[in-house]
């Protein structure tokens, strides 16, 4: 008969937690931390002997909370100012990190061409090839200046990580963490002379990709399609809609 005895809980992931029991107090309480990895098996050892008693501990489900504040709508220009469109409304199209945006008419399925006028924020006639890009985060131009920025690729992955909470074909899909609702609408990618993937939801990230390219989110227009953030990217001279984020 020992005055005291050690109790050790061993996890299949290598973790160990211990306590000590005694004849006077044979019940041992050992606090096991939440499991942030995959399911693990906990085995109980008393005085160095495996009791063959086990408990399975499932993976802790961490609720999704967006790490940034998302703009209520896409970036657009209205009345000579950079503003956000309504939540389910299309914004303007921008080359990668360009201050100049342009609108495209409905229906997008007709793959409309660039109409020759950009807003920066003043309306200016400009050939598509002459629209500068790569030097200005257009989100930073929303008042108060410097508050908003383009989302990183990781933030786009976070936004779409739980898929759609709602999906209406050809209209919108909803991403939400329960606190913020972010609607994505069909938009495509403009080359100036045509619109590629007009029914898909596409938007720029702030991250450059391969040489001359930038990373972006693409989400096809079906209920079962998965969001994809490209690693290599697409030409920075193409144009997409832009969503903005700011610090919480």
State each model region's role.
Residues 1-29:
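Surface-exposed binding patches on compact interaction domains or structured appendages
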Residues 8-12, 57, 138-139, 143:
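Short beta-strand segments and strand-loop junctions that repeat across beta-rich extracellular domains
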Residues 22-25, 47-48, 234-240:
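Extracellular interaction modules
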Residues 28, 38-48:
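A short beta-strand micro-motif common to beta-rich folds, especially ectodomain repeats
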Residues 33, 45-49, 247:
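Beta-strand-rich extracellular modules
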Residues 49-60:
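Edge beta-strands of extracellular beta-sandwich domains
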Residues 62, 68, 72-79, 86-92, ...:
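C-terminal, surface-exposed recognition/capping segments
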């Amino acid at each position: 008969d020992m005055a005291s005895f050690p109790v050790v809980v061993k996890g299949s992931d290598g973790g160990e937690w211990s306590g000590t029991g005694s004849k006077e107090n044979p019940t041992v309480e050992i606090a096991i931390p939440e499991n942030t990895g995959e399911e693990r098996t906990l085995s109980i050892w008393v005085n160095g002997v495996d009791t063959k008693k086990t408990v399975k501990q499932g993976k802790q489900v961490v609720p999704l909370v967006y790490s940034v504040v998302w703009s209520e709508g896409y970036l657009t220009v209205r009345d000579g100012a950079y503003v956000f469109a309504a939540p389910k409304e299309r914004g303007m199209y921008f080359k990668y990190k360009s201050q100049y945006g342009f609108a495209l008419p409905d229906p997008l399925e007709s793959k409309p061409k660039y109409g020759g006028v950009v807003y920066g924020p003043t309306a200016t006639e400009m050939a598509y090839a002459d629209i500068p890009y790569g030097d200005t985060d257009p989100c930073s131009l929303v008042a108060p200046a410097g508050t908003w920025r383009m989302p990183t690729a990781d933030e786009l992955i976070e936004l779409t990580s739980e898929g759609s909470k709602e999906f209406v074909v050809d209209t919108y899909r909803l991403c939400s963490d329960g606190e913020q609702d972010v609607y994505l609408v069909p938009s495509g990618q403009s080359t100036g002379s045509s619109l590629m993937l007009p029914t898909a939801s596409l938007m720029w990230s702030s991250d450059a990709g391969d040489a001359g390219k930038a990373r972006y989110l693409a989400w096809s227009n079906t209920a079962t399609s998965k969001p994809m953030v490209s690693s290599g990217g697409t030409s920075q001279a193409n144009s997409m809609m832009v969503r903005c984020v700011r610090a919480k």
